[in-house]
Amino acid sequence: MRRWYVSDFTLREIKQLDAGSWFNPKFKGARVPTFQEAIELMRGKAGLYPETKAPEVYGRFGFDMERLLVAALRRNHLGTRRAERHTPVIIQSFSPESLKKLSGMLNPKLPLVLLINEQMRTRWLTPAGLLEMKQFATGIGPAKALLDKDAVRQAHAAGLSVTPYTFRSSNTGQFKTVKEEMGYYLYELGVDALFTDNPDLFPREP
């Protein structure tokens, strides 16, 4: 099976895709928004949490993802001193190099979160790795299965926030409900925030 990249298509072609049916039939016909359209939809209502996704891959195709992202933010006065206060911006990436690049480009600085999967665990979820990360990031976003109280404590000791992923009702592991699972991570392990597909089930502090 051939692997396709976004850069293989024009925006007009991408806009023909059905982006909603895979999630729920009631969203059939939903179109893929551009980043600009997402900004216009969310401005003044909620924050933005963009991810530089596979930036090294697209870099080989001639796309400077970090430069394009920063240009879009500045064009919309986001992440600047003139920014809409109800639309804070946090940038996430699995790429340490991408965050390092962004750290040098952003003025004023924005929160930068290094996402961490199982393969990255031994490199970054250690006291030494966390201290190194502090040089270019403000937080970690690990897969939820990688966290325990000690890992959260070490990250906080290094001055990093902790935002695990992804909490959804279809995958709650040992917990009966996603609400119970989110409550455990928030109020037992002490994470600062979390990524969830079910914000409507977000638990309140007991």
Predicted regions and their residues:
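Short glycine/proline-centered loop/turn elements that form peptide/ligand docking sites
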Residues: 150
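C-terminal helical cap(s) of enzyme catalytic domains, especially alpha/beta-barrels
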Residues: 199-206
